[in-house]
Amino acid sequence: MKVHMLKSKIHNAIVTSGDLEYEGSITIDKELLEIADMMANEKVLVVNNNNGERFETYIIEGTRGLREIQLNGAAARCALPGDEIIIMAFAEMEPEEARNWQPMIVIVDRMNNPKRRHRVGKDNEYLG
């Protein structure tokens, strides 16, 4: 039996734009994806801290350095530009591996610049 564990989280990201006409997804700056150990097409759970909305979508890789967090398609109705969100990716693993698993947490500022990251239970690595 496998369990679903938090793999990575981008905490307190700010939605920069939305595109209702796009087919769906969330566009995330490539650098943030690398720092958070996330990748294009990966399924994510997004939580809107402003209204409590929770939704699943998949990642599209954005341009490095633009600090873009864009919601596309129906997801654009779940959060507005300026809303604070949490983006979480999960992984399946055996219970033995899960017991020692430490997810990657990335904290960003109000401009989506990465400020620090750490694995749960480990020291912070300050960025920028």
UniProtKB/Swiss-Prot annotation:
Cofactor, free-text remark: Binds 1 pyruvoyl group covalently per subunit.
Residues modified as Pyruvic acid (Ser): 25
Residues that bind substrate: 57, 73-75
RNA-binding as UniProt keyword: no
Name listed for the protein in its UniProt record: Aspartate 1-decarboxylase
Subunit structure: Heterooctamer of four alpha and four beta subunits.
Protein encoded by which gene: panD
Keywords: Autocatalytic cleavage, Cytoplasm, Decarboxylase, Lyase, Pantothenate biosynthesis, Pyruvate, Schiff base, Zymogen
Superkingdom per UniProt: Bacteria
Organism: Chlorobaculum parvum (strain DSM 263 / NCIMB 8327) (Chlorobium vibrioforme subsp. thiosulfatophilum)
